[in-house]
Amino acid sequence: MSFLVAIVGRANVGKSTLFNVLTNSHDALVFDFEGVTRDRQYGQAKYDDLDYLVVDTGGISDKDVGFDEFMAKQSQIAIDEANLVFFVVDGRSGLTTGDEYVASLLRQKDKKVVVVVNKVDGTDEEAAMAEFYSFGFDKVFAISAAHRRNTQKLVDKFLKKPLNEYYQDYTQTQEHKEQQRHGIHFSLIGRPNVGKSTLTNRMLGEDRVVVFDMPGTTIDSVSIPFERHGQKYTIVDTAGVRKRGKVKQTLEKFSVIKTLQAIQDSNVVVAVVDARQGISDQDLSLIHFAIKNGRALVLAVNKWDGMTEEDRIQVKQDLKRKLFFLQDYVDIHFISALHGTNVGHVFESIDTAYACANKKITTADATCLMQLAVEAHSLPMVGKFRIKLKYAHVGGHNPPVIVIHGNQVSRLPNSYKRYLENFFREALDFRGTPIVFEFKQSENPFADRKNKRSKDEGSKSKKVK
């Protein structure tokens, strides 16, 4: 599960602008994939190679009634789940009753809160911050999100330490969980009403999850441990993720965050697609997110029963066209969650993907495969010199990380990197898991001697003169 930063405050104080600064700095919004409109409500950001999630909770007001009141209450869910809260206020307009209301809500929570005084461009920062100390929060900081003034300092000062502490604790906790779990943790993801909860019940063999024929029945991730044929599993039925324009309720927006966190916390992700609706950009976004996070993947095309042969051919052609990047290694199953058709095969692919994602490979085997790949397809020339790959070893699991050391590796063409991935995948029979390749430049063991010799020769020449 990722570190979560919640941006809260009344309306029109610049929360969305700060959100864009935090997420756009590394162009890493959750749904910022080709052909998909960037979502401005929740996103993924990076600080010093550490990923974290950001949620803009929308304006909070003490005058909210009806549906707006419901949304304001659900915004508090995001605050409850957050590891750090940026409470944004407007430095130009000064302290308002709306700000005081938000502050009163935050004082009831045991949360790390930073009062972010925005829009201070052209004003005295100290004067702008002064009145906001009355909230009782000891951390107050002035920025101009629109002009990115002090925004990096904000992150360096208030995010760096808790983020590093969180991941240290989280790594230890995850290692403990893995020791205790000894099973496969997989999540079902997809749009609303594609049959995730029905598939969950079918896999469990009982009605553990409430199912209705309407979108959005599941609003939070439901985690259920179980055992099948002696193998332990934990299944996570996630909330459906809809198209950006249709995600309006704050509760639903936060359920998207929970879904993304479930993906990151899984060993294997099962992407469920409705055969009758086809695969959408939103399906592709979720699949891309899973792959980007190194998750093993299985695709289940549901509601296959009752379709004509002509429609089935059309669906398969559509899948082949849109999922061309998965054809080589991801298993695709055409199922009926309602009737149980082919659900057993989904389990088989989950087991296979998990095993491949955690496959043990010795340094000798990795190096041997690398050498065989080079023998089969020579390395390209870089100027007068040929790139040289020396040895390879495994740098991690789930996903498998192959680290290759050599000379001039930074100039290795992407086409050759793809060739290496395909070669390793075929040789090791990797199914269902992405493979990450890291290329490291080998250090010259004689570099220091050479530099020292040059210095000595320089000193001697000076003496001669």
From Swiss-Prot:
User: A single GO BP annotation from the record?
Assistant: ribosome biogenesis
Record has Metal-binding as a keyword:
no
Q: Which SUPFAM superfamilies match?
A: P-loop containing nucleoside triphosphate hydrolases
The protein's name:
GTPase Der
Pfam families (alphabetical): KH_dom-like (PF14714), MMR_HSR1 (PF01926)
The source's domain of life comes to Bacteria
Tell me the lineage of the source organism.
Bacteria, Pseudomonadati, Pseudomonadota, Gammaproteobacteria, Thiotrichales
Q: Which GO terms describe its molecular function?
A: GTP binding; ribosome binding
Q: Region Disordered: which residues? A: 446-465
Organism field: Francisella tularensis subsp. mediasiatica (strain FSC147)
**Which gene produces this protein?**
der
